[in-house]
Every structure is written in structure tokens, then in C-alpha cells.
């Protein structure tokens, strides 16, 4: 009589009911070893015993003589267990569970029997305190689900006791909490399902949230609902006010006692990785006396939002400004970040470069609006091609179809995924983006999938479908490392007679995947093998990385060309600048040799005929990597204006020509010399020279001729 529960005899009964053909198929399939498939050799020996091939079965069992379960199978088959009465090995329940897993994969037994077998194995190892229990539980979770490895007897529903909570005990050394601490669970009832009676005394309606005053809250991002009520400036009054009901989740945070400022609790040697530290000087003053909480109370992250326009729920501590808000040590054993806004009393500053030796290096801060995390990264200087390529998902297969066959494509994708081929896609659902070119969508579908499935129906005969076939075939021929990636698929809704002659001729050299076939599921398993899918995904990642690096290289080449052009422009500017300096030097020498007015202007600013030169500094020479810098100027060249250049610069205003105190008395003309001649004025009292209309008035003694004329 067949056994009802999972056991070795019941496994033999299942094999006996499978039939001769199925046993022959299992014999050849199990003969090839598969990595990570425990129990395959034992099942192969049992199949040989059921087929009557005792010689081969004896050889297989002899190879497994180190396995106690295999020796038990040999003794049971030989019929010697009744005389010797051997002790059952401890691993027999685990081996039976693995056998039932293989039988369930071959559809020879329901999955429920496999689950029962694993439950029995877990129960057996738990009763013996076997050290391999964790390994068995992991295997059971992977094969049967997460609920199979637990103990059903230990699961209880939650229960809420609406009675009075145990009174709080004030601990002198512990932290204080508002509004009421939770000391212990000794007097509590067992858990049951959550329920609410709606009474005013319900626990859920009286919960309040208190703010931890041990640190100024530095948020990485502001709350979308508005500023927090817990993070405003401290009010003049510290009297608690009623809480607006229904605006915050129940959460408890600790307040330190007033005497804890001088003696903070001991800090841990190393904070948890990735959590901010809080400085020990962030303390609170003027706190009201509240019941003390147990030492195990911990500050947890709470994102506070404004629920109503009511008054503040709790008194706020006075926060003193700290030296570095970005690196502050908390006074509680666990440092946890709280999302909130920074107090106005704190001043933002750059992060400190040093950290304690006992703490691990903190992770790089995420980009935010706070000054402490505003750092420039090298990736901001280049296009994020690698990041954009990683956003594109890789599919194990994509179904190309006609527009009228969208429902068939969705059904085929769901069926293939049900047969064990995950991450499938259809052309209409995953790649046809509205507004994008049809050919670009087709190319994306081909580039980001391991296998291309052509849905052969009577509608698959238009020009667009033929183009899809041609593109898929060319991709099959040209893509390296991806042979045999095009699969013609004949669904249940179609037949070979309904296909067009063009499509049939193009795909005549490829083997079809026919859904009408009786071994369709087996063909799917042989086609979409996991190692083939993993290899093609690895090849796809290499292609995406290569493409991203190529785009970055092109971007860098463009920037390099721009830098070379700018360098050439600056070199031309430098040449013109040096030429201008040489010309100005010649002009200054020529003008200086012919100056005759004893004005107080500098030598470099004096010109004949009342002319003037601006005395401003030359424009700053722009810097660029690899561009030569201009030579230093002499003191007399400080007022020279630059020549026209590729980039014009603003020049300072010219200074007025200095005024002479008195015009010199006219004298006989000196001997003329070739070149520029000085200006000589006779018989004039008022003289106006230059562009600034300065007047010189000479009222000294008159010439003898003038005196003679006046006497007459």
C-alpha cells in the first residue's frame, strides 16, 4: 500500500506510477550532473531500481556509499532492513525533501507534498538542535517560499490591552521623556490584533511626540508639507499646550535631564556606519521636570509636518549655536538622523576634514540645499552617460509583433514568464514610446534584449513587419557573442498556412518555437537557459559601458578642440599685445624728445599740443591652461591701453591734463629743427590749450612795443 506522507517508500510509489517512458526520460536527464542540484544521484539510482536495471543501480549506489541515505535505500531494496533493523540516519528527512523537490520539478507530485517534506525536515533538525538548521531553512525558503521555514506554533496575532499602563519609575541616571515613558513589558498582555474603540482614553489618541534637544536638526531635504513645528525658534513661554489631534504619527523621543549637561552618558566607541554624529555641546536649558524614561530609550528619525494651524504641541528647548553643525556628536547611544530644518541659531560651515579614529569614514553626502553638502563632483563636469545607460533595463526576450496582435503578444509574454523565463517584454508595451521614431524604438528593442521573438500571425505580413524581420536577422548576423538570438514563434492563434510567403521565405532557415507542440514547455526550458541569459546580459553590460565611454571620449575631444582654439586666440592676442608695447615705446621716446612744456604730468603722460594719455592699468590677461602669460610691464608702460584683441576689455577713464600755474613769457623763437615744432605764442594774455579747455592767464609786464603804443 502506498504511503500517504513524504518518505522513501512513497517516493518509490510515485516513480512506479510515472510510467516507463517518463522513467526512461528521467534516467537520461538525471545522468547529466547539474551543479547545485542535491539528491539528483540518489533519484537516478531509484529510477534505475524502478526500471529493473539493478546492475547500473548497484553501481550508482556504490558510488554513493558515503551517503547514509543511499545505504538505507540499498538495504530497503534488498529487503535486509527487517532482519538487521538499522537505525534511520538523521539526514533522511532532508534527503526525502530534496527528492520531492526534484519530483515536483518533473510534475510527478504536487508542490504541497514538497512543502510538507521540507516542513518535516525542518521540524526534525529543530528537535535535534542540529547546527545545519540554518542551511536547511535557507534552502526551504528558496524552494518553497519564506513561510515554509518558520515555526507556525510561534506566530501569534497582535493584541492591544486598553488597561492602565504600568507606572513609570524615575531613574536618576536615565534620560527623561515626554509625555510618558514605557518602562517594561512584564505586566503587559500577550499580543493580539490591533483594534480601536474610539474612546478618548485610547492609547493611539494620546500619543505625543517630543523633540530631542541634544542636537540642532540638520535636514538633507525639507519636508514637502511645510516647516516643522518642532524646529521653530524657542518661544518665550515653556508651558506645555494641548496637542492638535490626528496630525502626527505616534513616536517617542527622549529629553535629557537638566543635570546631564555636566555628565553626558558614555558614547559608543564607533557609531554605526552612514549615520551623522552630533557634538556633545548641543544641550538644552530651562526644561520642565518630566518623568524619567528608562535607559534604553532611543531617538528615532521622525519627519514632522504641520498638521493644523493650532498652537505648538510641546515646549521647545533653547538650542545653543554649535561650532560645526555638520559634524556633531549625539548624547544618546544610537545616533540617528532626523529630517527637519536647521535652527536659525546655528551657522552653516564647511565639513571638518578629520574624524575620530574609532569611527568608520562617513559616506559621501547626497546633494542637497544645505551648505555642508554642496560639493562639486567630477561627474558634474561630464555627461552622465554611464548613469543614463544603467537606467535602460535589460530584457531576457522581447516579442516583435504586428499592431493588431498586441493582445496575443501580451498573452505569450505572460505564458513564457509562467514557464520560468523572467523579465520579458513586448514591443508595444515596453519600447513603443509615443513621440519617438518607430525605427529607433525597434533598434532599442533589439539592442536591449537577449532573444528576439517574432510573433508569426496572419497580420505579420506588412512592410513594417518585414522590416522588423530584416533588422532582427541582420542583428543576429552582426552582433558579436549573440548567435541564434532570433526565434520565430507560432502562437495558438495562428498556423503555418496563414503566414505570408515573404515572411516564410526569410525565416525558413530558423527553427520555430511552436506553441501547438506537446513538448512546448521543454523547448522553452532548453532555449532560455539561465547561463545563456546571464552570458548575454554580461555582454549587454559591456556594450553599454563601451558606448558610454565612447560618448564621453567624444565629449572630451570636443572640449579639447575648444581649448585648442581658445589657446590659439590667446596666443594671437599675446603677439598683438607685445607688438603694441613695442610701438608705444617708440612713440614715448619720440614724444619725449620734443616736449617743451614744464607741466607736472608724468613723463609717460605728456604729449605735445595739450594731448594726453590715459593712466589706467592694462586689462587683466585671461588665464587658460597651456596659454603663455604676458611679460611684466615697466613702470612707464602702466598707463598704456591695450590694442584690439579677440576679447575686448573695458578701459579706465583718462585723467585730466594738469593745469600750469602761469603761462611763460613770450621769447624769441629758437632755431628750428626738423620734425615736430613747439608752439610759440606772442602778444597774448588769455591762452586756451588742449581738449579740456584749460585757460592760462599771464598778466605780467607787457612788451616794450605795447607800452609805446599805449603812451601814444
Curated annotation (Swiss-Prot):
Residue ranges, compositional bias (Low complexity): 650-666
Substitution effect: residue 377 to I: No effect on IFNB induction
Compositional bias per record (Pro residues), positions renumbered to this chain: 265-275, 347-369, 620-633, 640-649
GO biological process, one term: toll-like receptor 3 signaling pathway
Residue ranges constituting the TIR domain according to the UniProt record: 393-553
Outcome reported for the amino acid change (mutating residue 289 to E): Resistant to caspase cleavage, no effect on TRIM38-mediated degradation
Location of cross-link Glycyl lysine isopeptide (Lys-Gly) (interchain with G-Cter in ubiquitin): 229
Effect of residue 111 to T: No effect on IFNB induction
GO molecular function: molecular adaptor activity; protein kinase binding; signaling adaptor activity
Xref: SUPFAM superfamilies: Toll/Interleukin receptor TIR domain
Phenotype upon changing residue 157 to M: No effect on IFNB induction
Keyword Cytoplasm included in the entry's annotation: yes
Region listing for TRIF-NTD, in residue ranges: 1-153
Effect in UniProt of substituting residue 595 to L: No effect on IFNB induction
Subunit composition and interactions: Homodimer. Found in a multi-helicase-TICAM1 complex at least composed of DHX36, DDX1, DDX21 and TICAM1; this complex exists in resting cells with or without poly(I:C) RNA ligand stimulation. Interacts (via TIR domain) with DDX21 (via C-terminus). Interacts (via TIR domain) with DHX36 (via C-terminus). Interacts with AZI2 and IRF7. Interacts with TICAM2 in TLR4 recruitment. Interaction with PIAS4 inhibits the TICAM1-induced NF-kappa-B, IRF and IFNB1 activation. Interacts with IKBKB and IKBKE. Interaction with SARM1 blocks TICAM1-dependent transcription factor activation. Interacts with TRAF3.
This protein's name: TIR domain-containing adapter molecule 1
Gene, per the UniProt record: TICAM1
